[in-house]
Amino acid sequence: MKKFLLSLLFINVSFCNIWAQNEWERPDAAVGKQNETVKTVTRKEKVEDPKYMAGAVTENEGKVEWTCKINMPGKSSQQLYDLCLGYLQDFVKEEEQLPESDVTLVNKSQRVIVATLNEWLVFKSTFLSLDRAKLNYVLVANCTDGCVELTMRNIFFRYDENDGKGMTKILAEESINDKNALNKKKTKLVTGWAKFRRMTIDRKDEVFDKFRTYLADK
């Protein structure tokens, strides 16, 4: 009996020593540690395209206005006037134009053409929702010998904010200019006006590029 008790004591002491050495573990622990990976999530800051940032929306006497000059060496003011008038008369009838779009004024002696445009800016279109605004603007083509100056001005939107008030008129000067569409540091676009600013700039570029391409082919 004494020997039996001594044996038990010896076994207990041995197990204590083994546990103290910290060499025992669950059989699945090592596998778990091997398979354990540390995932580090790095959040990338969205970098805005410089074409939409500070200075992209120009103003003239506090009004949003874009102007491009198209040099046409060898063309008289009358020739350019005729070309621009023909182009704008077709432009106001293009598929994206609404019925209100039209060539509204001309000054034959000063070679100036004014067109009023009304079209949709579609921000998002899905099976379940449609987010869009009416873009209204004026194009002025001023023709001189060897040059056409094309100006986009009088820009405003009509937008339904789903507040029960229907379409609300929003001026470009209170939405897409630097003051309203950019944060104080001029490093980010402000949520809400960002989509208006991006799409209006894109549309302006498209209008000017198409006009420039048309004249270049003449």
Predicted regions and their residues:
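Bacterial Sec-dependent N-terminal signal peptides
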Residues: 1-25
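Ser/Thr-rich, low-complexity intrinsically disordered terminal regions
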Residues: 21-218
